[in-house]
């Protein structure tokens, strides 16, 4: 069939499909793929779809030897090798006549000038009509739209008439294909498998992303720092670092005195380190350098709280009814510690000298329970009570070291808390500088000799004798910045309801996740998955054995009698295997039987059975046979139990070697001195002693023993 007829037939089929879509005629798709559950109209399309899962590309190009999954793709590719239209000026080839004619017109100068003039006239005519506005506002869109704003009957679900719901979890999906893809989560199927590492994935896109890990190619490159990435999403996330650096340079800088500085000394000390590169300068000698410049990212004019972005600042509202408190939904954004940490990271990325003293100069800001107690109390708060509640949070933090013993360390409290201290008429104007020369130990104890809080006037606000009591348990969660969910039974606090519900399982004793292998139950699914790995590691030792002696007393009567073995193996399906032994003296006959477990594969059982039969027949270490029974209850890796002393071993070879102790046999004999040994390594190590005594003689090691 000529190529033009094939293309015409394919175009006719596509036109027919487009007409069906335009008329919204239902299409019958009775053929379903059993791997990804897609529907198809004909069995030929289903067979063509199976090539995706198998990875076959049967159609090969004769010119460049490229493979394609469909014949149409091959025919379209062959057109690239046959370009009938060639340009005489630039020697370019084209496969389409229309594109070739357009290309020829580009070489014509008159045509090129006519196009420029025409485009210039079109732009001049459009300017007075539309002006500079290229888009409509929201009100203009409603004016142009036939529906009114108050039309309550209009619903977005009219555009999606066919909404498919999952019968298991009740989720809604706009198409059947997405519902089928979602059903793979409940069935646990992962049809797309990696050829290199045998990992399986639920979607083909996930497999393609995973396959990039096996290759060293990084096609997506950053235009700023020339760093390469394998995924485009990681490149876009990386570019945000460069954009943040540009926006950081545009932040306003203000100069304030130490009395009105709202940011802690941590940020100012870090910024001075970037500018000067010297952390050794004393803060007491020049305090203005510490508070000279600070960055105001997005600050509220009323309560002087700092926020990460302008959007969070616009959502922040300081109302008198709230008493200056931040709403609960914005608590995370107002976490002072995280804001300072992010600003320091931005300063470090923006440029500056890196110093080891920066890491040693890490300081932490501590929140107090003072505001909470002040809100509950109606009158003037007790000074002694506020002193106890404020300092108690210091004992709940970890180790805190100073840079040197000579210098004191200062910690600044947030300005909003300082303002609250001043508004309570306590008689002191607290600047909020915590000076300490001591070290807080890991157990939370505080050395109170050099620990005190000073106000802006330099007078001592809280002395050493006041720092002895602690907060209540509820105050420990004020500075976390998360939504707290307390447990009503044990008074534990959790950041989310899901973690609280998981904690309730401890009080109820429920363990909803059961192991289908050993029957153990777990409280979390992660613990169950981690436990299942222990069963996967035991698959090489797929059969569980136990050895029983017929008569233990007869083991020690004739230790030197010869034993002849007759092994017979039955390999029908998962059948049993027997190994009979006959001895010259009166020893009870013993049989070896294997009973495979249900959860293990038959191939592993058969390979283990054949291996054990050959090991028993070929080795003459043991003169007695044993019977093996399944013992799946052990989960510590010791699967093979001795019936005499009840010891457990990890492999049958170690168990056989152990039985030589009960039998009193030492099959390895030294040909020089006549000593016998239970193991071959012991015998070889003994042979070296004779070699050292007689270095000139050659000791021949019999490898057949």
Curated annotation (Swiss-Prot):
UniProt-listed InterPro entries: Znf_C2H2_sf, Znf_C2H2_type
Cross-link Glycyl lysine isopeptide (Lys-Gly) (interchain with G-Cter in SUMO2): residue positions: 16, 116, 124, 149, 266, 698
Entry annotated with the keyword Transmembrane helix: no
Compartments in which it is found: Nucleus
Gene3D superfamilies, per the entry: Classic Zinc Finger
SMART domains referenced in this protein's UniProt entry, alphabetically: ZnF_C2H2
GO cellular component: nucleus
Disulfide cysteine pairs (residue numbers): none
The entry's keywords: DNA-binding, Isopeptide bond, Metal-binding, Nucleus, Repeat, Transcription, Transcription regulation, Ubl conjugation, Zinc, Zinc-finger
GO molecular function: DNA binding; zinc ion binding
Zinc finger (C2H2-type): 31-53, 59-81, 85-107, 164-186, 192-214, 220-242, 298-322, 485-507, 513-535, 640-662, 668-690
Stated role: May be involved in transcriptional regulation.
Membership in a protein family: Belongs to the krueppel C2H2-type zinc-finger protein family.
Official protein name in the record: Zinc finger protein 770
Organism in which the protein naturally occurs: Mus musculus (Mouse)
Recorded name of the encoding gene: Znf770
